[in-house]
Every structure is written in C-alpha cells, then in structure tokens.
Amino acid sequence: MTTIRLNLLAFLVMLSSISVAQNLPQEKELDVPYVASKPEVVKAMLTIANIDSTDIIYDLGCGDGRIVITAAKEYGASGVGVDIDPNRIQEANENAERENVTDKVKFIEQDLFDVDFSSASVVTLYLLPYVNLKLRPKLLEQLKPGTRVVSNEFDMGDWKPEKEIKVGESTIYFWVIPEK
C-alpha cells in the first residue's frame, strides 16, 4: 500500500511541475540573431535616407540602438528602436543615456510585427531575407507614400530598390513607399 501511495504522490508532483512549467513566461524566440551594423554602414544608411531633424526613424530589430542614437545625435532626428530581446533594449537605453539623446529616442521591447510604425518617415532594417519578405506587406500597408526604407544587407525580393550601394562588405538597399 505504501508503494502505491508513493507512486501516486510522485505522479502528482510530476503533474504539478508540468503545470507550473507551462504557466511560466516563455522566452521569446528571436527570428534574427543580433549582429551590429558597423559605424560606417550606419552612417551610409542615414545618408542614403537623407535624414534631417524633421525625421522620425523606426529601426526594426534595433539591437543596441546605434542607428536611432546616431540619427538623433548627428542629425537631430527622433527615433524609435524596436527589439524583441530585453537585453538589447536595456543596452540601447543605456547607450542613449550615455550619448545624451534620451529626449529624442525611445526603445520598445516588442515583436516588430506587432508594432504600429505608421508615423515613421524612415524605417531601417538589418534583418534576414525571409523576415524582410514577411515584413514587406506591412511596410507597404502602414507607411505613407514617400516614407523611406533602408535595409542593411538584404533586399525585399522583387521590390526593386531605388538605390543600392556597397559600403565595405555590406550592401545597403533604399526604397521609397509608392503612392497607393
């Protein structure tokens, strides 16, 4: 009889651990590994987009925040960085504070597919090809005609860029959202 009770107790403990584990917050899966854009690539991305102080830049997959921070510091633009990784968001906020641009930039921990970026005048990306392709319809739907889109390294399939430049080993692609 004691063996049956012990087995039943062990079974109940196992069931409760499974239930607890299922109710714990799940770590968000990252679609894109973090790879920082080189400073010369960031500069070229902002230059090709013709950034100025009136721009609102959304960097989707912002990592350490270097693109929106550079846009704020060097061009006076405002920026929003979006990343799903809380560690990158924390790092981006620390970097913005160190560069004294917290009044110009903010960072959001969120899946980029759930963000409303319709207020952007410029969107920057350093994602993977399949993520760019998945994001493309949302860019075309949400962004106003004339909004500029710049991607480090990866294109958007059959959406031909208006400009394409090489910076070292990197290729930068530039599009403008067309009239609807």
Residue ranges and their predicted role:
Residues S118-K134:
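A short SAM/SAH-binding and catalytic strip from SAM-dependent methyltransferases
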Residues Y130-K180:
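C-terminal substrate-binding/active-site "lid" region of AdoMet-derived donor-dependent transferases
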